[in-house]
Amino acid sequence: MVNNSKKYCYFFNQFFVGRNENNMRRLYADIILNKDELKDSSRSLIEIEYYKISKKIWRNVGKKINLYGIEIIKKEYLGRRKVKEKNNLYNITSDEGVIDNLLNVLKRNRVTPIGLKDVIEEVM
């Protein structure tokens, strides 16, 4: 039973997490908020990373298309501790230009992982 579980986890990682040529995650932007920009002075630094994610799927016989999504990772540095928060939305569109525009809006407005879904719903 344990052996089958390990095989399933390996399959899951290979198929869904992006360890093959059909999946991709690329850093789009990285912003850093320093202590002067933060209202809560207990935090010394916040880093927000915006990723464009894509997955190739078969649309018709012999034809693959890319479906694009977005992932945001927020890292808060509290002294020597680091707190990480992450959220993603898969398969938003097949148009890479739309995803680039969405990522630009997210970066410009410094959207954190918790607000990702709301902002995407508002913009789309």
Give short role names for the model-derived ranges.
Residues 83-97:
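A short, exposed loop/beta-hairpin motif centered on an aromatic-Gly-Thr core
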Residues 9, 97-124:
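Compositionally biased, intrinsically disordered linkers/stalks adjacent to structured regions
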